[in-house]
Amino acid sequence: MKHVLISFLLFTTVIFPTRIFSHHYSIIAHTISDSAREARSVSAADVDGDGDMDVLAGHNNISWYENDGSESFTTHTISTSAASSVYAVDLDGDGDMDVVGSSAGSVGWYENDGSGNFATHTICNHYWHRGFRSVYALDVDRDGYMDVVAASSSPNNKIMWYENDGSQYFNH
């Protein structure tokens, strides 16, 4: 019985390989920006609250690519500071998407006022924390406020979390 099953499986994979192992997917690349110099990170969120997904990018600055809903994007600069990682999250609980970003020596967040304007806030800016590479937000301590998690590479090799106290300040 085992030989019959193996023979059947070999026969079907040789005779009908496209039906069993092949799926016909079509992926088409669309350019959002051709000027995102040294882009390192992207995140998607409805930044402007209009119902379509926008794109954030971390590179020599932090950019927001506003989706107009018809596959066209308008570029906005959130910060002129370089960023190795960006993440969209409502940090202040006001219903709009803020942006968290990390760079070589700092982690910051950019408060969205709901009209496309962003105020800069520093979470961590320590000279000894060189090499922040990744940033994320979640409610680590389950107090209802989104906290920030950041990972750094050499020489620190640390993963840190910063507690959001609910008043737009972060404790180390």
Where are the regions a protein language model picked out?
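Positively charged n-region of N-terminal signal peptides that target proteins for export
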Residues: 1-4
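Bacterial N-terminal signal peptides
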Residues: 7-16
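Blade-edge motifs of beta-propeller repeat domains
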Residues: 21-37, 66-81, 111-130, 163-172
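Beta-propeller blade termini
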Residues: 40-47, 84-91, 133-140
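Acidic carboxylate motifs that coordinate Ca2+ or other divalent cations, activating on Asp/Glu
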Residues: 50, 94, 143
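Intrinsically disordered, low-complexity segments used as extracellular stalks/linkers
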Residues: 53, 64-66, 84, 97, ...
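Hydrophobic beta-strand segments that make up the repeating blades of beta-propeller
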Residues: 55-58, 97-103, 148-152
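Short glycine/acidic-enriched loop and turn motifs that connect beta-strands
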Residues: 62, 106-107, 154-157
